[in-house]
């Protein structure tokens, strides 16, 4: 085998010699390019391209050598041309495929079904009972039918508060009467439930006594016959007392007490729920492990039955962390379906949080160079709709909402997917040229 030399070896060999020119001397050899570092195999097309480029490189070396007086032959053979790739045959038909509903073995656990509201047959006065949960698969998947559709509860407050203009114009004439507000939500806006927020009980707002706040709950119960959720002000010191008194005046109605959390006396709220026949909303802040901990404490420390717990893992609005809320809810639902019995509960979303995003209610961008945001009368409801629908796909069951248009659109879409609303079939095969 011939000894291999590098061009630098030839230069070094003549470095110590007083040679000005070589006459009658021909240096023969081949130039080799080491491609050993390439991974993933050697493509024939790449080989042809490298051969062509190497031939050009050899010609350059020959010309340079000629400039210095070295005899060289320029007539090197041209590199072989790269053969054009064969044209792919024109596709006439799609590859035939058949979709079969999968039976995912990992989804072995059913989500707990939780009733809200007691009818006369159950010892209460509600006109209907709402059921949430009961799923055996992710929402709207064909793997297992959803036993219960998504439910919407519309917010009512025990005092006049500041609302986005697009929301306020729907309620302005009833905001001083929680009972009339609740009645309008049910009769005109088709609310499945009502959530009464006792925000005036906050010591920094009106510091309304629990006994007086309980009268507002009675007013709402008499005004409507749908199930209700009862919320406090968010004050961790006062909420347990307020919710306990509200639970007492609503005894036997199976309301949803909102909410028990790790930063307040959850045991007092759980005790009131058990004593007066209510459900408990287990609220945490975008933390699946905290949700597991609170659920575990409600079940094992407070002896709350599984069919009385609904989770609220927190809703972050579109543009303000919706991706975190979605991921958290989806992880919770997947873990539950795969057997985590500390998470096998239906979920609730404070979808109204969408109105906390400034993009939902501001007239336009504060930046002069920004683009037009469009009319807020449309933008605001869309913000709430997108927030709600995103979490519906993640597995949420109950939606706390405000704008009547948002409520109508979310119910229309989710009930269409659920199968209770028939819609015109759309040909999706021609989706590129379809007109909306």
UniProtKB/Swiss-Prot annotation:
InterPro entries: Ac-CoA_synth_d_su_TIM-brl (IPR016041), ACDS_complex_subunit (IPR051069), CO_DH/Ac-CoA_synth_dsu (IPR004486), Dihydropteroate_synth-like_sf (IPR011005). Keywords: Methanogenesis. Pathway: One-carbon metabolism; methanogenesis from acetate. Pfam families: CdhD. The keyword NAD does not apply. GO terms for biological process: methanogenesis, from acetate; one-carbon metabolic process. Belongs to the CdhD family. Heterodimer of delta and gamma chains. The ACDS complex is made up of alpha, epsilon, beta, gamma and delta chains with a probable stoichiometry of (alpha(2)epsilon(2))(4)-beta(8)-(gamma(1)delta(1))(8). Part of a complex that catalyzes the reversible cleavage of acetyl-CoA, allowing growth on acetate as sole source of carbon and energy. Probably maintains the overall quaternary structure of the ACDS complex. This is Acetyl-CoA decarbonylase/synthase complex subunit delta. The lineage of its organism: Archaea, Methanobacteriati, Methanobacteriota, Stenosarchaea group, Methanomicrobia.
């Amino acid at each position: 085998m011939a000894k291999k030399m590098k061009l630098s070896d030839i230069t070094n060999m003549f470095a110590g010699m007083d040679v000005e020119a070589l006459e009658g001397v021909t240096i023969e050899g081949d130039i080799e390019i080491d491609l050993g570092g390439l991974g993933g195999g050697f493509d024939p097309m790449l080989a042809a391209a490298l051969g062509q480029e190497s031939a050009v490189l050899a010609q350059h070396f020959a010309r340079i050598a000629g400039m210095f007086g070295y005899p060289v032959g320029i007539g090197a053979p041209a590199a072989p041309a790269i053969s054009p790739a064969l044209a792919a045959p024109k596709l006439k038909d799609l590859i035939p495929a058949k979709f079969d509903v999968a039976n995912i073995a990992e989804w072995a656990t059913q989500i707990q079904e939780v009733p809200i509201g007691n009818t006369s047959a159950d010892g209460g006065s509600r006109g209907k009972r709402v059921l949430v949960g009961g799923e055996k698969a992710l929402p709207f998947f064909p793997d297992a039918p959803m036993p219960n559709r998504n439910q919407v509860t519309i917010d009512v407050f025990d005092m006049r508060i500041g609302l986005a203009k697009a929301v306020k114009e729907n309620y302005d004439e009833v905001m001083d009467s929680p009972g009339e507000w609740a009645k309008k939500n049910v009769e005109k806006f088709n609310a499945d439930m009502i959530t009464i927020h006792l925000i005036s009980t906050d010591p920094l707002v009106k510091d309304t006594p629990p006994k007086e706040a309980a009268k507002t709950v009675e007013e709402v119960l008499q005004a409507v016959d749908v199930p209700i959720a009862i919320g406090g002000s968010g004050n961790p010191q006062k909420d347990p007392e307020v919710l306990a008194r509200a639970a007492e005046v609503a005894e036997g109605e199976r309301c949803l007490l909102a909410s028990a959390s790790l930063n307040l006396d959850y045991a007092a709220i759980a005790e009131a729920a058990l004593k007066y026949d209510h459900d408990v909303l287990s609220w945490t802040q975008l933390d699946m492990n905290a949700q597991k901990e609170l659920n575990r404490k409600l079940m094992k420390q407070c002896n709350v039955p599984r069919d009385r717990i609904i989770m609220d893992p927190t809703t972050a609005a579109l543009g303000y962390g919706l991706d975190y809320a979605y991921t958290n809810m989806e992880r919770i639902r997947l873990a539950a379906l795969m057997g985590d019995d500390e998470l096998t509960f239906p979920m609730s979303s404070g979808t109204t949080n969408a109105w906390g995003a400034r993009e939902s209610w501001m007239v336009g961008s504060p930046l002069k160079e920004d683009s037009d945001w469009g009319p807020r009368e449309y933008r605001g409801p869309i913000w709430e709709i997108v927030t709600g629908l995103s979490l519906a796909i993640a597995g949420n069951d109950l939606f706390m909402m405000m704008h009547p248009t948002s409520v109508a659109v979310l119910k229309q879409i989710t009930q269409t997917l659920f199968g209770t609303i028939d819609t015109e079939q759309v040909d999706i095969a021609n989706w590129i040229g379809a007109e909306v």
